From Swiss-Prot:
Function as written in the Swiss-Prot or TrEMBL entry: Sugar-binding protein which recognizes specific carbohydrate structures and agglutinates a variety of animal cells by binding to cell-surface glycoproteins and glycolipids. Calcium-dependent lectin. Invertebrate lectins may be involved in defense functions.
Name of the protein in its database record: Lectin BRA-3
Organism from which the protein derives: Megabalanus rosa
GO molecular function (one): carbohydrate binding
Entry-linked PANTHER family: MANNOSE, PHOSPHOLIPASE, LECTIN RECEPTOR RELATED
Signal peptide start-end: 1-24
Subunit details: Homotetramer; disulfide-linked.
The keyword Signal appears for this protein: yes
InterPro entries xref list: C-type_lectin-like, C-type_lectin-like/link_sf, C-type_lectin/snaclec_domain, C-type_lectin_CS, CTDL_fold
Free-text tissue specificity from the UniProt record: Coelemic fluid.
Domain spans labelled C-type lectin: 25-152
Top-level taxon in the UniProt lineage: Eukaryota
Keywords from the named record: Calcium, Disulfide bond, Lectin, Signal
Length: 162
C-alpha cells in the first residue's frame, strides 16, 4: 500500500469515527425537549400564527411550527408541555377543510377533538389543546395571540441516524 492510499484510508476512518460518535443533542439556547430524533420547544410568549412560524425559525435555524405524526408523539408533547393552547403547523389557510402542515410534511395523523375542525368564525390554524385530559386538537383564528410549539431535527447526527 502506498503512502497516499494509507492517508486516504486513515482519513476515511477518522470521518466514519467522527460521524458515528457525533453527539446528538438539542440546542442549548432554550429549554428544548428531546423525543424520537426531534427537539421541541414551547414558547413562553404569545404571537399570531404567522408570527409563530417566523419565531420558530428565529429561535433556531431549521426549527418550524411543530408537526405531530403519531399518538405517541402527541402524548409526549401533552406530558412535556405546560402551556395549554399552543399553535402547531397545521392549517387550512389555502383551501378550506384541507389541513396541511406548514413545513410540507404529509398529514397522515390528526387528533381533532369532537366537532373539530369546525371553521367557526374563520378558524384556519391548528392548536394543541392540552387543557383537556385527551390532548386533542382544535382549530382557531390565526390572528389570535397564543403560545406556540417549535420542532426541529436533533442536531449533530447524520440524517441516517448512525
Amino acid at each position: 500500500m502506498q503512502r497516499s492510499e494509507i492517508v486516504q484510508a486513515v482519513t476515511l476512518l477518522v470521518v466514519v469515527f467522527a460521524i458515528t460518535t457525533a453527539e446528538c443533542t438539542c440546542p442549548g439556547n432554550l429549554d428544548w425537549q428531546e423525543y424520537d430524533g426531534h427537539c421541541y420547544w414551547a414558547s413562553t410568549y404569545q404571537v399570531r400564527w404567522n408570527d409563530a412560524q417566523l419565531a420558530c425559525q428565529t429561535v433556531h435555524p431549521g426549527a418550524y411550527l411543530a408537526t405531530i405524526q403519531s399518538q405517541l408523539e402527541n402524548a409526549f408533547i401533552s406530558e412535556t408541555v405546560s402551556n395549554n393552547r399552543l399553535w402547531i403547523g397545521l392549517n387550512d389557510i389555502d383551501l378550506e377543510g384541507h389541513y396541511v402542515w406548514s413545513n410540507g410534511e404529509a398529514t397522515d395523523f390528526t387528533y381533532w377533538s369532537s366537532n373539530n375542525p369546525n371553521n367557526w368564525e374563520n378558524q384556519d390554524c391548528g392548536v394543541v389543546n392540552y387543557d383537556t385530559v385527551t390532548g386533542q386538537w382544535d382549530d382557531d383564528d390565526c390572528n389570535k395571540n397564543k403560545n406556540f410549539l417549535c420542532k426541529m431535527p436533533i442536531i449533530g447526527c447524520p440524517p441516517c441516524g448512525i
